[in-house]
C-alpha cells in the first residue's frame, strides 16, 4: 500500500473512531456569564500537594491551587460530549444570532458554483451530510461585531471573550502564583481585568476583531487584538498532489488541541468546497481562507482569466458556508510590481504573485482593488472579517523592509479606512523574512499607517539558512514581534519551504508558536501571563514531576523525554533527573541549603557559618581546607558556634 493511501486510511479511521481525549490530569471547566448560555471553557490542571515538613512517617502537606489555562480544543476534550464528526459541533452562537433579529434564512445558496456542486450527484460520497441553513443580513441591516460595538451594544460574544481572556485568574490566592514582573508593552493598554465593555471599546475603535461569521455558529468567540493575549493561527489545506478531506479534518482537530486560536484552510487541490464544509462544521475556532486560491481553480489555474464575477461568486460561496475571515490581496497595485524587480526572491506570496501577473497581463489595477467596496458590502452581510494580505512581503532577509513592502502597507492602511466605513472588521497581514534588528520597524510602520488595526504576521523568519527548522527561525521573530504589539502569529512548521505539513508537523508548529506567543505575553506584562510559569517552576523546585509534565505546553513530549532515561515509577518522585544525577542536582542542593538555613534561623548570622578572617589570607585558606577535610568533606554540615573574635 502506498504511503499516501495509508495516510488517508489512517485519517478516515481517526474521523470514524474519534473520542474525547482529555489532557493529562486536567478537567474541562466552564465559567458561566450573566446568562446560562454563556459558558466559557477552560482547562483546569490539578496539581499535587507540596511536602512542607513533618517526618517520613507523618509528613505535612500543603495543597496547591489548580491552574486554569486558555482552551481552544472545543468539545473534543469534554468527557460529557459524544463526538460525531458526521453531525458537526453544537451551534453555540445560534441563539445569540437569532435573538438579534437582523438576519434571514435563505431558501437556497446564492453562489452559482455552490449550486453546481450541490446538483452534482457524483459528489454525494464526499459531501458533508448535515448541511445547515444559510443566513444573511436582512435588507438594510449590518450584522458585524464592529457594527454592534459602535452602536454601544455589548454582545454575548463580547462577554464570553472577556471571561475567556481573564482565564479565571481572580480565583488565585497564592502569592507565589500571582507574582509577575512588570512588562514593556510599547504603548499597549493592558488592563488588570478585562471587562465586556473593554472588549466592546477595543472592537469599536478597530484595535481588535471578533471573527464570527453568522454561518459559523459552532465557533467559540475569540478576539484578536494588541491589548489581548497573543493568538496563533494554524494553516491546513490540501494541494493538487497530496492530502484528503479526512486528513484535513484530522489536522483541524489536532491543531485546535494544541492551541490553534484560528485555522486557515489554504486548500488548492480537488474538492475545495467540500473540504471546507467538513472543516467548518467541525471547527470550534474561526476559519480563514484565501478565496483567490479557489477562484484560480475555477479558471483552470490561468491567472489572466480571473475576473470580478468569478471572485464575487467565490466570496459569496465561502461566506455562506461560514468562513470567518478572508485574506484579500487588494493592496498590491500595478505601480508596485516594478519595485520587486531587484529583489533576491521577488514576489513570494502565492496570492501576491497571482495578482501581480493579472495586473501585468491587463495593465490595470486588480479587480480586488477596484471592487474593494463591493467586497466590503458582501462581508458586512455575513460578518466576514478582512485580513488584508501582504502580497509583497519579503521572502528573504535580503529583501526585508524594502520600498515595495512598505508601499503596499500604506495602501492597506487606506483600505482599512474604507472597510471601516462599512463596519467590516479588519486585520493587517505582515511579513515574512526579517532579521531581528529590523523587526520593530515593521510594527512601528504598521501602527502608524494602518491606524492600530490588529497586525497578523507569518513569523517573521529571522534567517534563511535553516530549511527543516524554520519553525525555530520564525519562532524567534514571532516572539519578538508579538512583544512589540503583533496581535496574531501565523505558525510555521518544520516543512516550511519543503512540503505540505502532516499531523506531527502541525503539532510541532503549534507548540513552537504557542511558546512564542506566551513569551510575548510575558514580555508585554499581560496580567496573569506568569501564573503557569510560576506553577511549573514551583513544581520543578519541589520535584513534582507529574505536575511539571501536565503544566507543560506539550505534556506528552515532556513525559516521554523524562522517561527515556528514568522510565521507572520511582523516577517520577526522585529528587533529581538524568541531566545531573542525584549528587549534582542544583535544586536538590538548593533545597538542602534552604533546610539548613531554616534549622539555623535562630542562630545569629555571624555564628551560623564560621568564617574567621585572618591576617594571612593564604594561612586562612589552608586552615579552612584542613577543617573541611577533617569534617568529612561534606558541603553542608550542622553549624558550629564560632568563638568570639579576639
Curated annotation (Swiss-Prot):
Residues 624-646 are annotated as: Disordered. Pathway: Cofactor biosynthesis; thiamine diphosphate biosynthesis. PANTHER family: PHOSPHOMETHYLPYRIMIDINE SYNTHASE, CHLOROPLASTIC, THIAMINE BIOSYNTHESIS PROTEIN THIC. Zn(2+) binds at residues 433, 497. It comes from Vibrio parahaemolyticus serotype O3:K6 (strain RIMD 2210633). GO terms for biological process: thiamine biosynthetic process; thiamine diphosphate biosynthetic process. It holds the Pfam family ThiC-associated. GO terms for cellular component: cytosol. This is Phosphomethylpyrimidine synthase. Its EC number is 4.1.99.17. Binds 1 [4Fe-4S] cluster per subunit. The cluster is coordinated with 3 cysteines and an exchangeable S-adenosyl-L-methionine. It comes from the Bacteria. Substrate binds at residues 235, 264, 293, 329, 349-351, 390-393, 429, 456. The gene is thiC. Its cofactor is [4Fe-4S] cluster.
Amino acid at each position: 500500500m502506498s504511503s499516501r493511501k495509508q495516510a488517508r486510511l489512517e485519517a478516515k479511521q481517526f474521523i470514524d473512531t474519534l473520542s474525547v481525549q482529555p489532557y493529562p490530569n486536567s478537567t474541562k471547566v466552564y465559567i458561566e456569564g450573566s446568562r446560562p448560555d454563556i459558558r466559557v471553557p477552560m482547562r483546569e490542571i490539578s496539581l499535587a500537594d507540596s511536602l512542607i515538613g513533618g517526618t517520613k512517617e507523618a509528613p505535612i502537606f500543603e495543597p496547591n491551587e489548580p491552574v486554569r489555562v486558555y482552551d481552544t480544543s472545543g468539545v473534543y476534550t469534554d468527557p460529557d460530549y459524544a463526538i460525531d464528526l458526521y453531525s458537526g459541533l453544537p451551534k453555540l452562537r445560534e441563539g445569540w444570532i437569532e435573538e438579534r433579529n437582523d438576519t434571514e434564512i435563505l431558501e437556497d445558496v446564492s453562489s452559482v458554483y455552490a449550486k453546481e456542486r450541490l446538483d452534482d450527484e457524483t459528489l454525494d460520497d464526499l459531501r458533508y451530510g448535515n448541511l445547515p441553513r444559510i443566513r444573511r443580513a436582512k435588507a438594510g441591516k449590518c450584522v458585524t461585531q464592529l457594527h454592534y460595538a459602535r452602536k454601544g451594544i455589548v454582545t454575548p460574544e463580547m462577554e464570553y471573550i472577556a471571561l475567556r481572556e481573564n482565564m479565571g485568574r481572580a480565583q488565585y490566592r497564592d502569592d507565589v502564583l500571582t507574582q509577575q514582573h512588570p512588562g514593556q508593552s510599547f504603548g499597549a493598554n493592558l488592563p488588570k481585568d478585562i471587562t465586556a465593555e473593554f472588549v466592546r471599546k477595543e472592537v469599536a475603535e478597530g484595535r481588535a476583531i471578533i471573527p464570527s461569521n453568522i454561518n459559523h455558529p459552532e465557533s467559540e468567540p475569540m478576539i484578536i487584538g494588541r491589548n489581548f493575549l497573543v493568538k496563533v493561527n494554524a494553516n491546513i489545506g490540501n494541494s493538487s498532489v497530496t492530502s484528503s478531506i479526512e486528513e484535513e479534518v484530522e489536522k483541524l482537530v489536532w491543531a485546535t488541541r494544541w492551541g490553534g486560536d484560528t485555522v486557515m484552510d489554504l486548500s488548492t487541490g480537488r474538492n475545495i468546497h467540500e473540504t471546507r464544509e467538513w472543516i467548518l462544521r467541525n471547527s470550534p475556532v474561526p476559519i480563514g481562507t484565501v478565496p483567490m486560491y479557489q477562484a484560480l481553480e475555477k479558471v483552470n489555474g490561468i491567472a489572466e482569466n480571473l475576473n470580478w464575477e468569478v471572485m464575487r461568486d467565490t466570496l459569496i460561496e465561502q461566506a455562506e458556508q461560514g468562513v470567518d475571515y478572508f485574506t484579500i490581496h487588494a493592496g498590491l497595485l500595478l505601480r508596485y510590481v516594478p519595485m520587486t524587480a531587484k529583489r533576491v526572491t521577488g514576489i513570494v506570496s502565492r496570492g501576491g504573485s497571482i495578482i501581480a501577473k493579472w495586473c501585468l497581463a491587463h495593465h490595470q489595477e486588480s479587480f480586488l482593488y477596484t471592487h474593494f467596496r463591493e467586497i466590503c458590502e458582501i462581508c458586512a452581510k455575513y460578518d466576514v472579517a478582512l485580513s488584508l494580505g501582504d502580497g509583497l512581503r519579503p521572502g528573504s532577509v535580503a529583501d526585508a523592509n524594502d520600498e515595495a513592502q512598505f508601499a503596499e502597507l500604506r495602501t492597506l492602511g487606506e483600505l482599512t479606512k474604507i472597510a471601516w466605513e462599512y463596519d467590516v472588521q479588519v486585520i493587517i497581514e505582515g511579513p515574512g523574512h526579517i532579521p531581528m534588528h529590523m523587526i520593530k520597524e515593521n510594527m512601528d510602520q504598521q501602527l502608524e499607517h494602518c491606524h492600530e488595526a490588529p497586525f497578523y504576521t507569518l513569523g517573521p523568519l529571522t534567517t534563511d539558512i535553516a530549511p527543516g527548522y524554520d519553525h525555530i527561525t520564525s519562532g524567534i521573530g514571532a516572539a519578538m514581534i508579538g512583544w512589540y504589539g503583533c496581535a496574531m502569529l501565523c505558525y510555521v512548521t518544520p516543512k516550511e519551504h519543503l512540503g505540505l505539513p502532516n499531523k506531527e508537523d502541525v503539532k510541532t508548529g503549534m507548540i513552537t508558536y504557542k511558546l512564542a506567543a506566551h513569551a510575548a505575553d510575558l514580555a508585554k506584562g499581560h496580567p496573569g501571563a506568569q501564573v503557569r510559569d510560576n506553577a511549573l517552576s514551583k513544581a520543578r523546585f519541589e520535584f513534582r514531576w507529574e505536575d511539571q509534565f501536565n503544566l507543560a505546553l506539550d505534556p506528552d513530549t515532556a513525559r516521554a523525554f523524562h522517561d527515556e532515561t528514568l522510565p521507572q515509577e520511582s523516577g517520577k518522585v526522585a529528587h533529581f533527573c538524568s541531566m545531573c544525577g542525584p549528587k549534582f542536582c542544583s535544586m536538590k542542593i538548593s533545597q538542602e541549603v534552604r533546610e539548613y538555613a531554616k534549622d539555623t534561623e535562630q542562630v545569629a548570622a555571624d555564628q551560623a557559618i564560621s568564617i574567621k578572617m585572618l591576617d594571612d589570607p593564604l594561612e586562612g585558606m589552608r586552615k579552612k581546607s584542613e577543617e573541611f577535610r577533617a569534617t568529612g568533606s561534606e558541603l553542608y554540615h550542622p553549624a558550629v558556634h564560632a568563638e568570639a573574635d579576639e
